[in-house]
Amino acid sequence: MSQESNSSSQVFSSPVERIYHAWNDALSRNDAEALTAMYAPDAIIESPLVPYLMGLERPIRGREEILAFWKLVAARKPNIRQYYRTGYLTDGKKLMWEYPRETPAGDQMDFVEVMELNENGLIQRYRVYWGWFGFGVLKRDEYHR
C-alpha cells in the first residue's frame, strides 16, 4: 500500500486519509486557501450554507466560488467548536463521516459530510447533510459566532 504525507510530515495510507485529516485541520484553522487547494478546479459544493451565506439557489462550482464560500464560513464560524467524531467510511474514492456538533448556544446539530475524490486525490464533489435541528439554527441566524 502506498503512503502519502503532508507538510507536517504525518504519513497517511491513502489520499482519502490525507484529505480527511488535512481538510479538518485547515477548517479548524479557518484557512480558506488551504481548504480550496484540496478541491479540483471544477469541483462542486452542495451545502445548506450556500444559500444562507452566498444567497445562491444552486451548488457552487469552481475554486473561485469555493474560496469565497470558505472565507464566509471562516468569518462566521464560532472560534470554539465541539465535535464528536468517531472516524470515517470510505470505498477508496468516496469519504463519508457523521458527527454531532455543539452550537454556540450549547445545542446539538447533526451532520453527514460526503466527499468524492478524483483520480488526482482532490475533492471533486462535497456534499453536506444537516439534521432537522440545523435548519432551525440557520433560520434563527444562530450559526455564527
Language model: regions and residue ranges:
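Short, low-complexity N-terminal intrinsically disordered segments enriched in polar/charged residues
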Residues: 1-37, 41, 141-145
